[in-house]
Amino acid sequence: MPKMKPIMIAAALTLATIGSVPADAGSPKPNAQAAYAAARIWGYEANIEATLGLCREMDSANAVAYDRLYHAFVTATAPTMARVYAILTEESIRSGMPPDTATKRLDPSMPRLVAKQTADANPTLFIEEQCRLGIGHEAEIGRLLAAVLPDDIKLIESWH
């Protein structure tokens, strides 16, 4: 799958204020590390979804295979992504901001843009290395987040 640096940087920058605003004394303290981990996971997950969508468009002969991969990925990551959104919402509140502050700053068009730029640079290579290598690996794609971002997954799993 594509490198995530631009997405991770953008996600981190959008959450820079989490933890910088003091919360009420009686409420839990903000956990910026958890918010950053959640944002990185969101960015990686969004990039996989965008890549699979672009694969479906560019390699339409294998559209059904990409649909299976997408379904397997979204199904497997749904609990993690629910936790990601819960963390981003709660950490915004703990930082004294409206609940949707962090989630509103995660730009869903960015992953598509990154995938599109990668594909435009070399369409044949994109299809061969980013798309077709995933075909038939529905079981593995569900474990991708934990394999690529193990520390972030551990951090959000231990968040409270």
Question: How should each PLM-predicted stretch be described?
Answer:
Residues M1-I9:
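Bacterial N-terminal signal peptides that target proteins for export
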Residues A10-I18:
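Bacterial N-terminal signal peptides
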Residues D24-R68:
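Immediate post-signal-peptide N-terminus of mature secreted/exported proteins
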Residues Y70-H160:
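Compact alpha-helical subdomains of small soluble proteins
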